[in-house]
Swiss-Prot record:
The gene is mukB. Homodimerization via its hinge domain. Binds to DNA via its C-terminal region. Interacts, and probably forms a ternary complex, with MukE and MukF via its C-terminal region. The complex formation is stimulated by calcium or magnesium. Interacts with tubulin-related protein FtsZ. This is Chromosome partition protein MukB. ATP binds at G34, G35, N36, G37, A38, G39, K40, S41. InterPro entries: MukB, MukB/SMC, MukB_hinge, MukB_hinge_sf, MukB_N_dom, P-loop_NTPase. PANTHER family: CHROMOSOME PARTITION PROTEIN MUKB, DUF4476 DOMAIN-CONTAINING PROTEIN. The hinge domain, which separates the large intramolecular coiled coil regions, allows the homodimerization, forming a V-shaped homodimer. Plays a central role in chromosome condensation, segregation and cell cycle progression. Functions as a homodimer, which is essential for chromosome partition. Involved in negative DNA supercoiling in vivo, and by this means organize and compact chromosomes. May achieve or facilitate chromosome segregation by condensation DNA from both sides of a centrally located replisome during cell division. Keywords: ATP-binding, Cell cycle, Cell division, Chromosome partition, Coiled coil, Cytoplasm, DNA condensation, DNA-binding, Nucleotide-binding. It comes from Sodalis glossinidius (strain morsitans).
Length: 1484
């Protein structure tokens, strides 16, 4: 017995809580035990994802979401994964003991949609020692590992020898391989199949009775009988095709003469036009080639003139360009002259303003000195006035004091005290504390002398200070000149800078004096440089024309070589005439020979066409007339042999068709009366009971029952006995066997199985020995196998018969063709080919024409070389006189040196013109700059100190004077004497006061007068200053304008600019003269070229016109050739004999055929339209399309599948003989293909009975299933009432509805739909077509209804609905149904899978806590009996006694979530439990 495949393990990599975990799956039940959130559902989700990796189906919801139309956005998968690469892999060992690892790579896709990317893969041949975890991860350390990406996994697996890695781009390919390896129970070809499988898994996972499955149990349990449907479709297609073929044959018979006329006229119409276009195209090509040669010759002839014209045009362009440059230079020179003149006028204005400015500066300096002196005098007057006022004040103070003393002379003590105070003040001021009033007078004399000395000293310092201030004004003047010339410099460096300026002025004067000489030298060098540039241009032009660079030193030698070359070329050009004359004579002889051969080619071509046709038909290379007659004799012998073989094949074919007809009957019986008798007796044919027997068991049962394999099995023979009396319509031998048709076994006979045979003990004294037949026919599988072989053999024979019939007719046509060839073409067919010689002569003619063309080209080339050499010699003659200038290499350097010197001299002249006067003024004042007046501050300080000393001595003298004056106060001899003395003193003081006031008045008057004079001097100074500033601003503006002009002028600048302008005007005049000369020469050259150009234009116009015709016709001709070659009509259209006819004859032939075709296709709209389109002369391809359309029309009408040829002409020849035979054969075939409605009803009925029996067999596996109050589960199959009525009418009342089934307009499916609608008018067929409804009625599944029933408690059998059952009962019932569905799928797919493969069986059950222990035990028993694996999830408190249990505990360690797993074997088994192992996954 074949061992069933098993899932060995499930591996999760990088799932939520599982980094790398492998669950070893039990052979029966694997339990995942754990609390809420332990990871049970995640484990099952990983298993289902690896099994069905379809994101459109996957939706892992918990039980609280059951029935919800929308769950979480990621459908439960995204949240179960970790970031990065994840894997879910299933390890499977199938029936072949192949270890296969199938799984998927999952990866989260970033985004709000929470999508997951899935890639399925497969690893086959992995060694047993390598675990899935080891292959999917890579160990990085003791406690760390890395998940491998899919590409690295592929590379790692492929590195292991003998291991196959395959990645799948589609889920269909993935499931196809899983089906072939026995992983899934059925082939999942489409998304609908995957949806069914997923719904089954989903129903298993969440438990209960799935309405999605119970509502469509027919689709899950009943296999599609595609063979029956395909047989009906093939039958209808064959009948339709047969009827169409018969109709086509009848139409073809009536149109055969028209077709002959149509194809002959179409061939003449299209072939004549085809060959006419081919001839015209060849002629146009020849004309185009001739014109092209003439054009090329004329172009070469014109080339020399064009070269000369181009050279002159180039020289004219250069001269015109030079003229433009000269005009630009001349205009620039004129503009420069205007600028120089403007600058000169501006320079004159600047000079005038500078003179005025210098004069104003001189007057301003003088006025400044006057104002300074006046200001000094004003200061002296102010000082005198201040001293006078001070003296007046002092005298008034003294006088007041004395007056006061006189007023209070009664108070002598006060006076005496005042005297003492005066004495103390004198002591303090004089620093003489011991001085007495008696010593005051001598001391006063001393201080008077000191006052005189201080005054004299002060006057000395004042004189020195005045002298220093006068020197200061000259220093400032000299320093201002230095700053004006050299810019800002320090006062300490002013003297050194002034000396350098004076020295530089001498060198600047020397350079300025050389300006005129340098200008003359510069003009001369510029003129020589222009001459050198002209020489270089001539040399470059000469080298360009000669195509080679020549150094100037070799020009003399080159001139001699050119003169010799011109003489040689002149001699070569004169030797061209004789060679051309000889070539023309040879060309005329070749052309005459070609014309002779053309006249002989027509008859030979017609014979060759006939000979080629014979060679193609016979397959022999006919090279002589003897071979033609021998081949004709062989054809007669081959015809006799083929006819005999055809008759033999026809007999064998009839025999096989009889066998096929017998085996096609229901049950394989060749007697339809047996079916009627079986229905009459209420029994079943033995062959129908064993209709499902496999092909391997068919020989055994065929030998077992022997002659009774067509027996009728009845429940009770005694009931049949009465009906046997008077039975007439029955076979000669009728076998009846008593037994239950629903549970029939083969224990009817005593049987002993032998090697290749059986021994049947019919009775004690009767044995039957039967060998296993070589070709068993017992059972549907055996009959179908035999029918398949017979059908293939019949098809081969039919094809062979058709081939032989065609060969006979082909041989007859060949014999007739040979006869016609011998009579018409045998005399000329084997002569030499005239066209071969014509092709040789045409090649020779082309060579001669090319040789003539080449000769003409060489002659033209020699002439061009001659003209080029002559023009080069002319240029060289112009260049030789300038050779000396051309060889002067130092000219540019000398020019640059002189230009640099001239620019320096020009800068020196401009410098002197700007600063000459300032330098002249500075030169005598240089010495003043040696000492800075700012260094004489000490002198001013000494002056002030002397002034302070004078003032102090004066105060001391005044104090002493006061003491001396008060000395009388020290003696109060008597009051009168004191008053008298005081009166004298008062008078003196009054006199001094008067003198002081007079001096003060004089000083004040002098101050006022001098102040008015100072004001007048200041106004004059301000006026001069304002005028000076205005002129200085104007001078700056003029200088800026001169700078903006950008021209540096000197005395000769205007003369040089005018000279440059005159020189350019002269050069421009000469250039214009040369240009006019060249224009005249060009006009003359163009006049000479007009004749050649007119000729060339005419030739080009003719050539382009001809070429345009060729090119425009090329696209159409290419499309014509493409159509001809693609459709294989070149042999019909390319008639070489028409190539020798004139275009008018071919056009006349085509027009005549067109008139006949218009009448022939008048009734055919398509051909008429195509013919009308083909009359367009601009679209020749449409005639080919018409010819192809005619051939296509003929092929469609004469049925190429009947007349086996690709040529409609040959098909027309075969048609007369073939049509009668095909008519008879097709009529008989239609009778054989027709199927009765009764047969259809029997086939559907038998199929329904077979499936009912199969469902009953499946129910036997559900009898022992019990869950809670449910004692048993079964599937109830019934036939729909409307469909049962349809079957009854088809089998018994078909005569009443023959109007439907005998109609030629309706197919059998359409007739069946019409009958169904007639019997059930209340049923609305909606928008479905009768053909669609009829095809559905041919599917037996639409006749059945399947329901699930349970035997529950006292209620008995009732329909299984979730509302009527407890949760556990519903889970158990639903699980039982799913097991039956899986078993049904396996049986259905057994023929598609390998014989040595028994697929894996596995279902799921989540939340098994809803089942009691007995129900779980029932599930275990069911898994054991059906060899099915089951994965259930249970809470922690449930521990099944069997299978393998995994305890899952989710923990969090260091913020890392992982699942702690402990695997245990069932503790109810006898074997010792393995040690509990725990594997903790830690995320790295």
């Amino acid at each position: 017995m074949i061992e069933r495949g098993k899932f060995r393990s499930l591996t999760l990599v990088n799932w939520n809580g599982f980094f790398a975990r492998t669950f070893d799956l039990d052979a029966l039940v694997t339990t995942l035990s754990g609390g809420n959130g332990a990871g049970k559902s995640t484990t099952m989700a990983a298993f289902i994802t690896a099994l069905i990796p379809d994101l459109t189906l996957l939706h892992f919801r918990n039980t609280t979401e059951a029935g919800a139309t929308s769950g979480s956005r990621d459908k439960g998968l995204h949240g179960k994964l970790r970031a990065g690469v994840c894997y879910s892999a299933l390890e499977v060992v199938n029936s072949r003991h192949q270890r296969v690892l199938v799984g998927v790579r999952l990866q989260q896709i970033a985004g709000r949609d929470r999508k997951v990317d899935i890639k399925p893969f497969m690893i086959q041949g992995l060694p047993v020692k390598v675990t899935p975890t080891e292959i999917l991860t890579m160990t990085m350390g003791d406690r760390q590992a890395r998940v491998l990406p899919l590409q690295e996994l592929k590379e790692r697996v492929e590195a292991i020898e003998g291991v196959l890695f395959k990645q799948f781009n589609s889920i269909t390919d993935y499931h196809s391989l899983m089906f072939d390896l026995g992983v899934v129970p059925r082939r999942l070809r489409s998304s609908a199949d995957r949806s069914k499988y997923y719904r089954l898994i989903e129903a298993s996972l969440y438990g209960g009775i799935s309405s999605a499955i119970t509502r469509s149990l027919r689709d899950y349990l009943l296999p599609e009988n595609s063979g029956v449907r395909k047989a009906f479709q093939d039958m209808e297609a064959a009948l339709r095709e047969n009827r169409l073929t018969l109709e086509a044959i009848r139409v073809t018979q009536s149109d055969r003469d028209l077709f002959k006329h149509l194809i002959s006229e179409a061939t003449a119409y299209v072939a004549a036009d085809y060959m006419r276009h081919a001839n015209e195209r060849r002629l146009h090509l020849d004309d185009a080639l001739t014109l092209r040669r003439d054009v090329f010759g004329s172009r070469k002839q014109l080339a020399s003139e064009q070269y000369r014209h181009v050279d002159m045009a180039r020289e004219l362009a250069e001269i015109s360009g030079g003229e433009s440059d000269l005009e630009t230079d001349y205009q620039a020179a004129s503009d420069h002259l205007n600028l120089v003149q403007t600058a000169m006028r501006q320079q004159e204005k600047i000079g005038r303003y500078q003179e005025d400015l210098e004069e104003l500066a001189f007057r301003l300096e003088e006025q400044n000195e006057v104002v300074a002196q006046s200001a000094e005098q004003q200061q002296e007057n102010e000082a005198r006035l201040e001293a006078a006022e001070l003296e007046v004040d002092e005298l008034k103070s003294q006088l007041a004091d004395y007056q006061q003393a006189l007023d209070v002379q009664q108070t002598r003590a006060i006076q005496f005290q005042q005297a003492l105070q005066a004495l103390d003040r004198a002591r303090e001021l004089c620093s003489l504390p011991a001085m007495t009033w008696e010593d005051a007078a001598p001391t006063l004399a001393i201080y008077k002398e000191r006052e005189q000395e201080a005054t004299e000293r002060l006057l000395g310092f004042e004189q020195k200070l005045n002298i220093a201030e006068a020197a200061s004004s000259r220093f400032e003047q000299a320093y201002g000149l230095v700053v004006k010339i050299a810019g800002q410099v320090s006062r300490s460096d002013a003297w050194q800078t002034a000396r350098e300026l004076i020295r530089d002025a001498a060198s600047q004067r020397h350079q300025a004096e050389r300006l005129q000489a340098l200008r003359s030298q510069l003009n001369e060098l510029e003129q020589r440089l222009r001459e050198q540039q002209d020489a270089e241009r001539l040399l470059q032009e000469f080298c360009q024309r000669m195509g080679q660079d020549y150094p100037p030193e070799e020009l003399d030698v080159v001139q001699q070589e050119l003169e010799a070359r011109v003489e040689t070329l002149s001699a070569t050009v004169s030797e061209a005439g004789e060679r051309r004359l000889a070539l023309r004579q040879t060309l005329e002889q070749v052309t005459a020979r070609i014309e002779q051969l053309t006249a002989r080619a027509l008859a030979w071509l017609a014979a060759q066409d006939a000979l080629t046709a014979l060679s193609e038909q016979s397959g022999e290379a006919l090279t002589s007339s003897r071979q033609v007659t021998d081949t004709m004799q062989l054809l007669l012998e081959r015809e006799r042999e083929t006819t005999v073989e055809r008759d033999e094949v026809a007999g064998r074919k009839r025999c096989i068709e009889a066998q096929i007809e017998r085996l096609s009957q229901p049950g394989g019986t060749d007697d339809a009366r047996l079916t009627t008798l079986a229905e009459r007796f209420g029994g079943v044919l033995l062959s129908e009971i064993y209709d499902d027997v496999t092909l391997d068991n068919a020989p055994y049962f065929s030998a077992l029952y022997g002659p009774s394999h067509h027996a009728i099995v009845v429940p009770d023979l005694s009931r049949v006995r009465e009906q046997l009396d008077g039975l007439e319509d029955c076979p000669d031998d009728l076998y009846l066997i008593e037994g239950d048709p629903q549970s029939f076994d083969d224990n009817v006979f005593g049987v002993e199985e032998l090697e290749g045979a059986v021994l049947v003990k019919v009775a004690d004294r009767q044995w039957r020995y039967s060998r296993f037949p070589a070709v068993p026919l017992f059972g549907r599988a055996a009959r179908e196998s035999r029918l398949e072989n017979l059908s293939a053999e019949r098809d081969v024979l039919a094809e062979r018969y058709a081939t032989l019939s065609f060969d006979v007719q082909k041989i007859q046509r060949q014999h007739q063709a040979f006869s016609r060839f011998i009579g018409a073409h045998l005399a000329v067919a084997f002569e030499p080919d005239p066209e071969a010689e014509m092709r040789t002569l045409n090649g020779r003619r082309g060579e001669l024409e090319r040789e003539l063309s080449d000769h003409h080209g060489q002659n033209q080339q020699s002439r061009q070389h001659y003209d080029q050499a002559r023009e080069g010699l002319q240029l060289l003659n112009r260049l030789i006189p300038r050779l000396g200038v051309l060889l002067d290499d130092t000219l540019q350097d000398r020019l640059e040196t002189v230009q640099a010197d001239w620019h320096d001299a020009q800068e020196a002249a401009r410098y002197l013109s700007q600063h000459q006067k300032a330098l002249d003024q500075l030169e005598p004042l240089v010495a003043v700059l040696q000492s800075d007046p700012e260094q004489h501050e000490q002198l001013r300080a000494d002056y002030e100190q002397a002034q302070q000393t004078q003032r102090q001595v004066r105060q001391q003298a005044f104090a002493l004077t006061e003491v001396v004056q008060r000395r009388t106060h020290f003696s109060y001899s008597d009051s009168a004497g004191m008053l008298s003395e005081n009166t004298d003193l008062n008078d003196k003081l009054r006199q001094r006061l008067e003198r002081a006031e007079a001096e003060r008045s004089q000083a004040r008057d002098a101050l006022h007068a001098h102040q008015a004079q100072l004001t007048q001097f200041s106004q004059v100074q301000a006026s001069l200053k304002s005028s000076y500033d205005a002129k200085q601003d104007m001078l700056k503006e003029l200088m800026q304008e001169l700078h903006d002009i950008g021209v540096q002028v000197d005395a000769n600048a205007e003369a040089r600019a005018r000279e440059r302008r005159d020189q350019l005007h002269m050069a421009l005049s000469q250039n214009r003269g040369r240009r006019n000369q060249l224009e005249k020469q060009l006009t003359f050259c163009e006049a000479e070229m007009d004749a050649l150009q007119k000729k060339l234009r005419k030739l080009e116009r003719d050539y382009y016109q001809t070429r345009e015709q060729v090119v425009s016709a090329k696209a159409g001709w290419c499309s014509v050739l493409r159509l001809v070659k693609e459709n294989g009509v070149e042999r019909r259209l390319h008639r070489r004999e028409l190539a020798y006819m004139e275009a008018e004859d071919l056009r006349s032939m085509s027009d005549k055929a067109l008139g006949a075709l218009r009448l022939a296709v008048a009734d055919n709209e398509h051909l008429r339209d195509v013919l009308r389109l083909s009359e367009d002369l601009k679209r020749p391809e449409r005639k080919i399309q018409f010819f192809i359309a005619v051939y296509q029309h003929l092929r469609e009408r004469i049925r190429q599948d009947i007349i086996r040829t690709d040529d409609p002409v040959e098909a027309i020849e075969q048609m007369e003989i073939e049509l009668n035979r095909l008519t008879e054969e097709l009529t008989a075939r239609e009778q054989k293909l027709a199927i009765s409605s009764k047969s259809v009803a029997n086939i559907i009925r038998k199929t329904i009975q077979r499936e009912q029996n199969r469902i009953r067999m499946l129910n036997q596996g559900l009898q022992a299933v019990s869950f809670g109050q449910v004692k048993s589960v079964r599937l109830n199959v019934s036939v729909r009432e409307a469909h049962a009525t349809l079957l009854d009418v088809l089998s018994e009342q078909q005569e009443q509805h023959q109007d439907l089934f005998s109609s030629q307009r309706l197919t059998f499916s359409e007739a069946l739909a019409k009958l169904y609608q007639r019997l059930n008018p209340q049923i609305d067929l909606r928008q479905r077509t009768p053909q669609t409804v009829g095809e559905e009625l041919l599917d037996y599944r639409n006749y059945l209804e399947i329901e699930v029933e349970v035997n529950r408690g006292a209620d008995g059998w009732l329909r299984a609905e979730s509302g009527a059952l407890s949760t556990g009962e519903a889970i158990g019932t639903g699980m039982s149904i799913l097991v039956i569905v899986v078993q049904s799928w396996e049986e259905e797919s057994s023929r598609l899978r390998g014989k040595d493969i028994s697929p894996c069986r596995l279902l799921f059950l989540d939340e098994a806590a809803r089942l009691d222990a007995k129900s779980i035990a029932t599930l275990f028993e069911l898994c054991d009996r059906l060899q099915m694996q089951l994965i259930i999830a249970a809470p922690e408190n449930i521990s099944p006694e069997k299978g393998t249990t995994y305890k899952l505990v989710r923990k969090v360690f260091n913020n890392q979530e992982h699942v702690h797993v402990v695997g245990l074997l069932g503790f109810g088994t006898e074997q010792a439990a393995p040690p509990s192992t725990a594997l903790t996954e830690t995320d790295s």
